């Protein structure tokens, strides 16, 4: 199986705080990798280092390498915007652009990169919304404001907006934590379907969700990668006692 993202001795500092400590992971292509661990363990910090979002914070310092198809995304010659186009992000709280329609939300990324023909935009919108199983629910009101959608629909719209620009990797930071159980199920089913085309890395507090949706799991504690491996093995026969204590609820 090809490695899509290779994380090599990655460290992330915020001022004097060492948030992610010397982490190395190989993420296989077209799989789901879950990042689990207690609050404040570095999960989201780790995730956001994979598309250079920490560049936006002046006190952040990243060392080590993140290789996307063998090329270091932190190389000085690499444009961070081009990386964020290849590595999309879906946040914890649905964040559709509130002043835009459903239609305009989906094509927003394309419009940032230049003019788009109406026929091309129509195709992008339909294809993206179909891929997230939202087309049939909204096809008759594409010009309606995106804020009229339910929370679950808004999150699927955000995923549609992400995949519309054709990324290769999708990062998800607790994408279902703010949703009801039915919407959560739809997001989980969607994640499974999306791996046919994308590599997905998801942060979740919900260990049952990690077990359901992921192929591989990384357990973090206090900025350290404690254990990484196939999800089924990690949840049934973990190698480290700290991992076992966490997944059995002894701490966290």
UniProtKB/Swiss-Prot annotation:
InterPro entries: AAA+_ATPase, ABC_transporter-like_ATP-bd, ABC_transporter-like_CS, P-loop_NTPase, PstB-like. Keywords: ATP-binding, Cell inner membrane, Cell membrane, Membrane, Nucleotide-binding, Phosphate transport, Translocase, Transport. This is Phosphate import ATP-binding protein PstB. ATP binds at residues 37-44. It is found in: Cell inner membrane. It is a peripheral membrane protein. One of its GO terms (biological process) is phosphate ion transmembrane transport. Part of the ABC transporter complex PstSACB involved in phosphate import. Responsible for energy coupling to the transport system. Belongs to the ABC transporter superfamily. Phosphate importer (TC 3.A.1.7) family. The gene is pstB. GO terms for cellular component: plasma membrane. Transmembrane segments: none annotated. The complex is composed of two ATP-binding proteins (PstB), two transmembrane proteins (PstC and PstA) and a solute-binding protein (PstS). Its EC number is 7.3.2.1. One of its GO terms (molecular function) is ATPase-coupled phosphate ion transmembrane transporter activity. Residues 5-247 form the ABC transporter domain. Its main location: membrane. It catalyses: phosphate(out) + ATP + H2O = ADP + 2 phosphate(in) + H(+).
């Amino acid at each position: 199986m090809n490695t899509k993202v290779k994380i090599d001795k990655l460290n992330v500092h915020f001022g004097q705080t060492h948030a992610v400590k010397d982490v190395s992971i190989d993420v296989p292509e077209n799989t789901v990798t879950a990042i689990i661990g207690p609050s404040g363990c570095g999960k989201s910090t780790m995730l956001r280092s994979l598309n250079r979002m920490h560049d936006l914070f002046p006190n952040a310092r990243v060392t080590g390498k993140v290789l996307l198809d063998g090329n270091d995304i932190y190389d000085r010659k690499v444009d961070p915007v081009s990386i964020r186009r290849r590595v999309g992000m879906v946040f914890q709280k649905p964040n559709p652009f509130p002043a835009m329609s459903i239609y305009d939300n989906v094509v927003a990324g394309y419009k940032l990169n230049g003019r788009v023909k109406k026929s091309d935009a129509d195709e992008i919108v339909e294809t993206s919304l179909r891929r997230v199983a939202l087309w049939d629910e909204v096809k008759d009101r594409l010009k309606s404001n995106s804020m009229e959608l339910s929370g679950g629909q808004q999150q699927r719209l955000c995923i549609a907006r992400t995949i519309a620009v054709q990324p290769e990797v999708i990062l998800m930071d607790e994408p279902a934590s703010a949703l009801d159980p039915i919407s959560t199920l739809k997001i989980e089913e969607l994640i499974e379907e999306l791996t046919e085309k994308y590599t997905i890395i998801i942060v979740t507090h919900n260990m049952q969700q990690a077990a359901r949706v992921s192929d591989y799991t990384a357990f973090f504690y206090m900025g350290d990668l404690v254990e990484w491996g196939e999800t089924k093995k990690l949840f049934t026969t973990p190698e480290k006692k700290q991992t076992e204590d966490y997944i059995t609820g002894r701490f966290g």
